[in-house]
Every structure is written in C-alpha cells, then in structure tokens.
Amino acid sequence: MKEVDLGKSLDREMSLWRYMSIDKFIDLLSNQKLFLTPLAYYQSSDPFEGFVPKVAFEATMKIFIDRIEEAEAAGVEIEKLLRERVSSPTTEQLEAIEKMKAMSKAHRESLIPLNNKISKSTCVHCWYHSESESEAMWKLYSDSGKGIAIKTSVAALVDSLNVCNQDVPLRLGRVKYLDFLSNELTPKDCVIDGATSPLLKRKEYEHENEVRLYSVPQLMTAERWESYEPRPILVKVDVSSLIENIYISPYVGEPFTSSVRKICELLGVPNEKVINSKLLENYEKMLAGFVKV
C-alpha cells in the first residue's frame, strides 16, 4: 500500500480549502475520488505550468548531460582498448560500438523533449491554504457564485488518502512562487519539498497560496514516454474523513442553500458539517449583537 509522501514545508494542522462548482462537488461525493489534472491541461491559464526557471532547468540538464558524457567517455575508452588489443575487430564488435554511439546521440536529442513530457504529464490536485475563507477564491472557482468550499486540513487530507489502497505514488507539497526571470535565482531557490516543476509557479499567481497533491506517471523508459499522452489520474479518497466542513457560497440564497443541504443529506454528509458562509453578512447587525446597550 502506497502512502502519501508529505513535504516538510507542511504542518499537519494547516487548514486547506477546495472551492468548486456544485456539479464537481456531487461528483466527488458520489465517486469518492479526487481528480488529478495533468499540468499540460493548464496551458491556457498559465503557459509556464510544468516549466521551471532557467537556472533550475540548466542545473537539471547538467546532471543528465554529465551522465551521458561519462557513458560516452567509457565508450571511447572501450573502443580504444579494443583497437589496441585486436588488430581486426569483428563486425559484431564494431556494430556494438556504433550502437553505443547511436544510443548516446539519441539520449542527447531526447533529453529536453523527455524532460518536458514528464513535467507536463505530472498530475496535480490543488488546495488553497488559509485559516479563513477567501472572497477571491469564491469568485474564481464557483459557477457564477453558485458553489461550495470544502474545508479540511493537511492531516485530514493525508489520512483520507492513506486509508484507501492507492496504486499510484502520491506526494503533497507547498507551491513556491518565484520570479522566473530573475537573474539572482539559484538552483537551490528552485527546490521545494524535494521537487521542482509541480511545486513552482510564477509570483503573479501567489494569491492562490497553493498546496498540491501530485503524482508522476511511472513509465521508466524513454520509449514508453515518447508514446505517452498526458491524461488525468483518479485517486480514491475517504470523503467522510476528508471533509471537516462544507461552506455554501455567500453569493447565493434559496433555493440553492437548501438544495446543497439536501444533497449532503442524501450523500451522507452530516448537516452539522454544512455551514452558510458569513463572508458578506451585514456587519452592522453583527455589531448590534456584540454589544448590549
């Protein structure tokens, strides 16, 4: 059984929010699965998704290029020794040498496309970190104001996944926001919770304050990656332990509010977990309730 690999930047008590439309909420309750989206699918909203700053990309490429050059140097040495010790190498020996050279060339040519393919195929499920509701998140992720927000914690999210028998590796980490074009960035700046691309975004998106659950397809070989097309991953989750509270959008009234409560009742969510957002509640009335005159 695979358990979630929890990033060190996260505290288990941190509050997390997931804002969504009612149809996605019903789908979650009905199917008991989280939808992880390939980074490739976010191209329209953020063309930099799946990419890293130049300094991080160069450092990553250097690691792989160094390995290729080590293999090439070993190949050159083998060929040199062979020609020194054997006056007339056999056809099979010469073919083996040429095959090594061709493999090295292919590895070099596929290095950047393969790196991009792996990054774009990484699947993520995003949560907003805050101890309170966010007016901006309501507007961004509800359907014309008709939406709900699930409130949970890092601990509840991890535990709700771990009780299910996961068949894909899952990691949870906090997104780091950087100026991708800054000349002062170092490779170390571009690592968070042991990862780069799935947990790096531009500073322009810092308002999202994201915590990401993510998974990288385990294909292993370059040949399999070449034919792979990014696709979503569905992971099982125990919704009853995931949900601490459900908040109903502050931009709606009846019959939406009672409809959400009925849906929750039918799908097994206790009524005491369902809360009407007080984000836009009349503050003058609230003050009157605070002070007795």
What do the predicted segments below correspond to?
Residues 1-293:
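Partner-binding and oligomerization surfaces adjacent to conserved cores of proteins
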